[in-house]
Amino acid sequence: MQPTQYVGIQDIKSLGTLLDKVAEHKGCGTSSEGGKASCGSSDGPADMAPEVWEKVKNHPCYSEEAHHHYARMHVAVAPACNIQCNYCNRKYDCANESRPGVVSEKLTPEQAAKKVFAVASTIPQMTVLGIAGPGDPLANPAKTFKTFELISQTAPDIKLCLSTNGLALPDHIDTIAAFNVDHVTITTNMVDPEIGQHIYPWIYYQNKRWTGIDAARILHERQMLGLEMLTARGILCKVNSVMIPGINDQHLVEVNRAVKSRGAFLHNIMPLISAPEHGTVFGLNGQRGPSAQELKALQDACEGEMNMMRHCRQCRADAVGLLGEDRSAEFTTEKIEAMEVAYDGATRKAYQELVEQERQAKSAAKAAEQQELAQMADQSGLSLLVAVATKGQGRVNEHFGHVSEFQIYEVSSAGSKFVGHRRVDQYCQGGYGEEDALETVIRAINDCHAVLVAKIGGCPKDDLQKVGIEPVDRYAHEFIEQSVIAYFMDYLERVRSGQIEHRPRGDADIRQGAYTSVQSTSAAA
């Protein structure tokens, strides 16, 4: 496979250079269809209405492809909550846990707006501002909508989102629509109050605390009503569901059907996070989360009904950056107060045009590799999972030792698709390999036949091979899906020639708890 020639975003050093390159390309990439010009992926999928594509094409949560290129941020202006979930424990000054409901500091709407402008100026591919806590945005409506007002006045190009439990949602539909909030996420874990009572100890509704089945029934009815009202307004709705083995894991298939029938655009089934150190009811009671195999099986079962989101990172309520990274420490209130923030919409637009060129090149590369696969692959049903070390842009561009998460792709004769991610402790710490960390890495990708990396040291390479995971660095800096397909074709050839024997892999762990990582540029390990 020949190296792809492209203009890398990381090569842009100044605004002058950026604008020169945009002018050179006239803001558009060129597709592989007879050289016909098109602005990145602006045409959208054939099965998606143009107005929907405009809403999702650069939204990293609503588009799996977009999450490789575009960033999001959350602002923590909503500390209060109107329900209690057994999987949640809100923390307001926590820096070392990566999960919903956790922030390092609470913000006023004015502080939040300045933070958004600072981030947007520093990370021009940040396209989405979401309010997701640490409580519920609609249990804090004044702060939530004041924040939206301040941001929309100065930065109308930034998409506004909120994530809610849905209890107060029907009361705020008009205001949500008035602020042009095009994306709302509702966390829906049940459509049967008998099951819901084991997830929600209480809700606070109409100045009264409700418990048991009554609480679950009210919450369910309000969630379904809110979803129906949003879809009637043309607002895209994503439904988040937490998979809790033994409680709602089988029931989530029914949830999937119920939300689809009410117009939900996307369903995101997430694994329960129940590490005891988080202090949740489920965590302290020993409720386990699902294995990687269990989670994928449920997602696969629901995929035939509607679009499934598999790239969720269950991020903090103050997350900043690409999905899978968190740059919030760069934008603390103290640091932002010292900044001179000037919002430059023209610069952001020019930068994002370059992102679209990169996406167009990626799509063309995948299509070319897919065509070759169709010509040579058999129909035996053989499929593999492949782990990928990446730091963004849809490329195999991360050193094995510096990875804090692997992206997981499933590949077969039908092509490749993203099916999830696995958090890991960084193997390279202070320039040296940590054997304990390597063990967690192996457990996290144990169901994968290979791991694609930009670079890997001899010791971890040997250890991976011993457990049957093939480390592959020959696709360094190439597009991920193109590389995954190329690896699969090579794998098929080796199986056919008798060089290797295909053997199924086992299950893998889903990482929980805080990250254990250090910032290191060492190439050791």
Curated annotation (Swiss-Prot):
Gene3D superfamilies: Aldolase class I, Dinitrogenase iron-molybdenum cofactor biosynthesis domain. Its cofactor is [4Fe-4S] cluster. It comes from the Bacteria. [4Fe-4S] cluster 1 binds at C81, C85, C88. Residues 503-525 are annotated as: Disordered. Pathway: Cofactor biosynthesis; Fe-Mo cofactor biosynthesis. Binds 3 [4Fe-4S] clusters per monomer. One cluster is coordinated with 3 cysteines and an exchangeable S-adenosyl-L-methionine. The two others probably act as substrate. Residues 67-316 form the Radical SAM core domain. Its EC number is 4.-.-.-. GO terms for biological process: nitrogen fixation. Involved in the biosynthesis of the iron-molybdenum cofactor (FeMo-co or M-cluster) found in the dinitrogenase enzyme of the nitrogenase complex in nitrogen-fixing microorganisms. NifB catalyzes the crucial step of radical SAM-dependent carbide insertion that occurs concomitant with the insertion of a 9th sulfur and the rearrangement/coupling of two [4Fe-4S] clusters into a [8Fe-9S-C] cluster, the precursor to the M-cluster. Belongs to the radical SAM superfamily. NifB family. This is FeMo cofactor biosynthesis protein NifB. It comes from Herbaspirillum seropedicae. The lineage of its organism: Bacteria, Pseudomonadati, Pseudomonadota, Betaproteobacteria, Burkholderiales.
